[in-house]
Structures are given as structure tokens and as C-alpha cells.
Amino acid sequence: MFPDAQVPYLAYYGTLEPPTQVKPGEGVFLEYAPMAKYKNPNSDGYRTYVPMEQKYLKPLMEMFGKENAKVLEYWIDNSMYSNYTKPPKILNVDPEPVRKDIAYYKSLGIDEITTFACYLGQDYEDLYGIPDIHAYTQAF
């Protein structure tokens, strides 16, 4: 019915390990959403992204290939940083991990990289003013 349709394999929490029983069909591409890496900061509070992505992302890329691969990041997902409660916390973007992430994804051949941006609406502006995402944009 839709011969050119595409659908993502969403690699997220319980689906980070590549499937072992099936292979991706025609039109299935990888969408990597590495939320788990934000739940495991190291002793300095800096998230340990490289080991997790080497463990999961490389095998996923081997299975799905880089064609149409996408990353859905959480760099400015203030809902997560606010523990999914209101009022939102102030957003602090550290550009260095964003730069490292982008460089790593690009080294694997992934060009389409996006991020969630949540809890940055009117209630955030009423508390803190317009969200400062300058550090995030500078990483690109």
C-alpha cells in the first residue's frame, strides 16, 4: 500500500540490545534514544556515555546500518532534569558533552541528530525567563 514507507526501530531502554531472533526488514531504520545514559552519572556527576554507546550503539549500527539512522537525545529535556515534576528546575546545558556526543555520532556516520526540549514553556519563563539554550546551539 505504501511501498516507500519507513519505520524506526526505537532503541530505548529495553530495546537497546540488538534483536537476536529477527533481522530488520525493508524500510526499517535505527532511531537511537539513549535516555538510560542520563540515569548513570559517574562520581563527578558526569554521565558515562561512551561505554554505554560502545556497548549498544555500535552493535545496533552493525545490524541496521547508517542509512537513515537517527539519534533522539535528551540534552535539553528539562522534564527529565526536573524529575518530571513541576515547577521545572532551571536548565543548565553543558556544551562539552553535547559536542562529544555529536562528534561520536558523526564518527559512526549518523547525521540526523535531534533532542527533546520539554518543560521550557510559559511556566519556565515565568520563573526564570526565556530558557538559555545558547550553550546547546554552540555545540553544533
Model-derived features: positions:
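Catalytic-core regions of glycoside hydrolase
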Residues: 1-140
